[in-house]
C-alpha cells in the first residue's frame, strides 16, 4: 500500500468495506494470455490502489503485460449498491474479477421458411458482444432497477445450482419490462444479458442472446404459425442443450402475442391464433425448466399484456421516463464524451448533482455551468431516454456546426434543442 493510499484512508474514516466488488477486465481479442496470469497482474494493480472512489476504470498501465493484453480494467457497479460515489477499501472487500473478450461478429439472422419464403424470426448474438459494449453503463435510471435485475438473476441461478425444489419454491427466470416507448427496455434486456454473461463467466464459457421477432411468429396463414413457433423453439432448444452456454431469449413487444389471443376470443381472428399463442406459452414453460436459460420480455402496452404471460414473470418492472436527476446524469455523460473527443474544448470539470446538493445549489464560478445544466435537465422532463441521447447531436447540428465549441456555447445550443423538441411535439399533436 503506498503512502498516498494510507493518507487518503486516514483522511476518510467512513471508507466502505466488506462489499462485494466486481472488477471487469476486458482482454484484447488477439491476446494469448491465460486467465490465471491476467488475474495475478490485475490483483497487483488493485493492491497498489487500495482505496478507490466508486466506479473507476484504467485504460493505461505501467505494467507492460497489462498494456499488451488488456483494453481496460473497470471497478463496476459499486454505485448500484452505494447510491453515490464513496471511498471503498479494496483490501477489506471481496473482489471478484471477471475476464472477458468481446465477440466482434455481430448478429446472425435466424430465418424460418414459410410458403417458399424466408421469414426473419430472430437475431442471434454470441455474448459478450462488441455490439453491446458500454450499453449497460449508458442506461441511467432513478430507482434500483439495474441492481434488482442483477440480484434476481443471480438468485435464480443459485437456486437452480442448489437444486431447490421448484414445486415448493417457485421461480421461472422470466422477466417482463414494461413502460412507454423509448425508455430503454430492449436495450436494458440486451445489456443485462451481456453483463450477466460476464458476471457468470466462471461457470458458463459464453452467452447466447436470441431476440425473437414476435410478429414473424404469426403467419398470415394462422394454421402454419404453430409450425413456425415449433421450429423457432427447436433452434432455441439446440442452444440450451449446450451446458457451457448461458442462453437469453428476448421476446420484444410481447403484447403482440397476447393481442392475437384476445382478438381470437373476440372472434376477430381465427381460432388457430389462440392455439399459436398457447403454443408459445407452452414452449416458454418448457425451456424455463433448464437452469441455463433466462427469458426476457418487453411491452409498450401494459394494459394489453395477457395475464397468462404476466403470471409467468417473476419480475414485472415498470420502466418510465427519466426524472430530472437521471436526465442530468445522461447529459453529463454525453458532455464528458464530447470533451473526450475534443468537440467540446477546452475540457472543464462539471459538478455532479450530488456536489450541487452539498453546496446547497449555491452559484459561483465553479458551480455556474453545472447549475445551468441542471436547469436544462429540469425543463427536459418528459422526454424519453432515446430522445435525450439524440439531443447533443441535434444541438450541434442545428445551432453550432463547428468542429470545436466551448462548454458555454454547447449548453446554450442544448437548451435551444430541448425547446425545439417540445415545440415539434406540440406541432405534431395539433396536426393529428
Curated annotation (Swiss-Prot):
Superkingdom, natural source: Eukaryota
Binding-site residues for ATP, renumbered to this chain: 179-186
Name of the protein: Pachytene checkpoint protein 2 homolog
Transmembrane segments: none
Keyword ATP-binding applies: yes
GO molecular function annotations of the record: ATP binding; ATP hydrolysis activity
InterPro entries with a match to the protein in the record: AAA+_ATPase, ATPase_AAA_core, ATPase_AAA_CS, ClpA/B, P-loop_NTPase, Pch2-like
Native source species: Xenopus tropicalis
